[in-house]
């Protein structure tokens, strides 16, 4: 057997050394501007900001901590400062349809000015109208008008009385109108006396009554017409007087806002309503302090402020102090927070509202600018996505109540006029949320036409290493903390590479790096150091791991006490050491696991015990099926594959998924069939395809370190090691203690590309090559396996016969 190829210690990690950098401390370099390693995302995002057409909202996808939010804020703020300030918006009373307040648009700052101008105008209405209607000239005109009609009324009443008297009737005037009372023997007769009269007298009265009603009818019509004319002329006088008093003030306001056609129309409507309701401005209070009305306001007149309520202005968007386009960030996108709401007052159990209780939402604040939201917040808040998609689709802000959206019965409410929306929505979230929204809403692509994908890693180039140093400098300047020396920067670069799990990559999850920087500064302070060094970085990483490795230590204890059985010496048939990664959320570690296989005569094929126990995931099940394909392709070309096999991850109670153990399981099955023992001082990881090629897997660094830690605690023998796919060599970023053990020849890492390479390493026997007849050498591993499978097939056929 030839000596197997193994990796040199120099291939197990890629170091970063101070001589590679051109500074001694971060004090000598400039802080970072922008983001690192996100060229594709930056290009997409900047293009999305530049497109102003409908549907070009932006979804920023990628894992947290890659710089999405800071870049979004910085880029958006820079652009927003160069863009125009959007319109102010006001809601005002709708005199034609009070249930639908009108939305008025103004240039920035003019909304606030209009509100003040209208308040001042209404105050002028009060003072000028009271002055005009208390003036002597008005009183003279009104008295003259009233006197003229009084004379005419008296003349008509006298004529009516004469007609009534002619037929023995008397005219009586009450609040209810004009009545005719019969006169008998010079005395007016009431209802009681009328019943006592004789029938002849009654008949005469009835006859005369008809005559009176007939002749007095025309006079009554004249009286009614005269009263109407009196009111018309009085109203005309009031209108003329009121117009003279306030018209020039109204004209002044209209002239100020002459460019706004809808505002002019609204002011005209205000003027007409005021002139039609002049009495509410000029009548004096009649209720005293002790009146019932003062004790129970709901039974008396409305408070004075209610008189002018409908002339007020509800300014819901004010940009008087704004510079550039607005940027609104929300982490609580409830329906009401987004679209706004109409508030209510409760008065004696009744809900009341008016247009002044309309409250603008985040859409109103962001209109003409940018709304920044988190996908998770939108998806976890009821009706938030529906509100957002409706604004993006209709380009209107419609303030429907959430109860209406849910179909609930609500109290009568207002229907404010929708406001045109011009909002660029920028949503931040993971790729998972993007796919979820895309699946959930078939129009999602129409709303978010730009996707900016932020990568979790970047190439390990000199330029990116320099930018990481600048990132550290930016952290130092922002936090006002001590500087980092060049060794600390090198340690951070190595940590970044380890986080990316690639020798040729660096992590872009800078929130993780920032945590290390923050804690390293603290350790340096506790030691009284002047600079943060590599030792502080290493201590930070060590202490961080110690805080989170309780579960790992519990497993280690069970391994040491042989509660969990793993052999690291000797050899066993049908038994092998597999490797898995346990992910605890913010901490992951490698964990060795014993895998066993048993084979016997039968036709049930390979049975995955994990699957039978419902502890296996779909990807692991697929890996088991691939093993069946390999066995059939390799051995069963000339006879049927008659085999029963059970494969098990021993002492696994938490479930397993992934195909990274498929090669390991295959070795175990081959060992059982060939009756050849497998070395227990080696652990194996790697996926296999149906052609026997070893494929890359994830978490190779953690897996190696997990088996190494177990071997080190039990004592390194010099023969122990791990078999990995050759395609994973670039992923190795091992700890220094593993690198040193390999350097000292105490631990070994074997990269392989074919299943046959692992067979020879594990079983110490040549796998054998198939000849033209389709057979393997008898004393090879494959030959022994084929012999056993043929024997199984014969027995199976014999049992059938």
Region roles according to the model:
Residues 1-438, 443-461, 465-486, 490-526, ...:
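Conserved ASCE/P-loop NTPase catalytic core
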Residues 354-363, 369, 375-382, 386-388, ...:
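Peripheral, non-AAA+ core regions of ATP-driven protein-machinery
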């Amino acid at each position: 057997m030839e000596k197997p190829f193994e990796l040199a210690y120099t291939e197990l990690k890629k170091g970063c050394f101070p001589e590679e950098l051109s500074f001694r401390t971060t004090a000598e370099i400039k802080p970072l501007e922008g983001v690192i390693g996100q060229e594709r995302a930056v290009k997409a995002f900047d293009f999305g900001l530049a497109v102003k057409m409908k549907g070009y909202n932006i979804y920023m996808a990628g894992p947290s901590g890659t710089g999405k939010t800071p870049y979004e804020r910085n880029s958006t703020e820079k652009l927003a400062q160069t863009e125009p300030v959007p319109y102010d918006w006001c809601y005002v009373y709708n005199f034609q349809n009070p249930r639908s307040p009108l939305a008025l648009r103004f240039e920035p700052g003019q909304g606030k000015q209009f509100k003040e101008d209208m308040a001042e105008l209404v105050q002028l209405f009060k003072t000028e109208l009271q002055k005009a209607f208390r003036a002597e000239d008005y009183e003279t005109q009104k008295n003259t008008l009233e006197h003229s009609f009084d004379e005419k009324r008296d003349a008509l009443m006298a004529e009516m009385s004469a007609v009534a008297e002619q037929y023995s009737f008397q005219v009586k005037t009450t609040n209810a109108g004009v009545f005719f009372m019969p006169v008998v023997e010079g005395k007016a007769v009431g209802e009681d006396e009328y019943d006592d009269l004789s029938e002849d007298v009654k008949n005469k009265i009835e006859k005369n009554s008809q005559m009176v009603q007939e002749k007095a009818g025309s006079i009554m019509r004249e009286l009614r017409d005269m009263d109407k004319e009196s009111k018309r002329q009085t109203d005309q006088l009031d209108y003329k007087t009121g117009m003279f008093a306030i018209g020039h003030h109204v004209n002044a306001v209209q002239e100020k806002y002459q460019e706004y056609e809808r505002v002019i129309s609204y002011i005209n409507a205000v003027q007409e309503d005021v002139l039609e309701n002049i009495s509410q401005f000029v009548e004096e209070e009649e209720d005293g302090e002790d009146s019932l009305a003062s004790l129970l306001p709901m039974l008396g007149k409305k408070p004075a402020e209610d008189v002018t309520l409908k002339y007020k202005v509800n300014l819901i968007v004010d940009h008087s102090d704004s510079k550039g386009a607005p940027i609104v960030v929300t982490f609580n996108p409830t329906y009401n927070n987004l679209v706004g709401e109409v508030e209510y007052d409760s008065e004696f159990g009744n809900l009341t509202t008016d247009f002044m209780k309309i409250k603008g939402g985040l859409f109103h604040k962001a209109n003409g600018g940018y709304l920044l939201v988190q996908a998770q917040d939108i998806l976890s808040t009821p009706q938030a996505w529906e509100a957002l998609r409706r604004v993006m689709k209709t380009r209107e802000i419609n303030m429907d109540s959430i109860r209406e959206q849910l179909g609930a019965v609500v109290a009568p409410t207002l229907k404010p006029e929708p406001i045109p929306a011009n909002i660029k929505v920028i949503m931040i979230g993971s790729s998972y949320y993007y796919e979820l929204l895309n699946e959930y809403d078939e129009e999602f692509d129409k709303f978010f036409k730009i996707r900016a994908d932020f990568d979790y890693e970047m190439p390990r180039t000199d330029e990116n290493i320099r930018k990481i140093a600048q990132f550290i400098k930016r952290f130092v300047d922002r936090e006002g903390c001590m500087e980092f020396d060049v060794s600390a920067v090198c340690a951070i670069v190595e940590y970044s590479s380890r986080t990316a799990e690639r020798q040729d990559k660096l992590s872009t999850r800078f929130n993780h790096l920032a945590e290390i920087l923050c804690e390293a500064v603290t350790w340096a302070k506790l030691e009284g150091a002047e600079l943060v060094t590599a030792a502080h970085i290493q201590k930070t990483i060590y202490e961080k791991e110690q805080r989170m490795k309780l579960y790992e230590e519990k497993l280690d204890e069970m391994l040491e006490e042989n509660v969990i059985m793993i052999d690291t010496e000797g050899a066993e048939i049908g038994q092998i050491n597999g490797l898995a990664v346990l992910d605890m959320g913010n901490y992951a570690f490698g964990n060795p696991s014993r895998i066993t296989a048993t084979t016997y005569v039968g036709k049930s094929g390979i049975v995955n015990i994990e699957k039978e126990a419902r502890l296996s995931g779909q990807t692991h099940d697929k890996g088991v099926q691939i093993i069946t394909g390999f066995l059939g392709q390799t051995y069963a070309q000339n006879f049927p594959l008659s085999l029963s096999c059970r494969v098990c991850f021993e002492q696994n109670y938490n479930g397993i998924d992934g195909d990274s153990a498929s090669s390991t399981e295959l070795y175990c099955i081959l060992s059982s069939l060939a009756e050849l023992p497998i070395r227990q001082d080696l652990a194996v990881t790697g996926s296999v395809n149906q052609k026997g090629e070893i494929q890359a897997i994830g978490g190779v660094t953690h897996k190696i370190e997990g088996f190494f830690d177990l071997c080190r605690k039990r004592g390194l023998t010099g023969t122990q090691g791990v078999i990995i796919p050759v395609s994973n060599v670039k992923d190795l970023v091992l700890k220094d203690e593993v690198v040193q053990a390999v350097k000292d020849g105490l631990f070994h890492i074997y990269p392989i590309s074919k299943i046959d390479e692992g067979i020879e390493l594990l079983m110490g026997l040549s796998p054998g090559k198939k000849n033209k007849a389709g057979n393997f050498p008898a004393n090879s591993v494959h030959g022994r396996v084929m012999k056993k499978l043929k024997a199984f097939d014969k027995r199976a056929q014999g049992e059938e016969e």
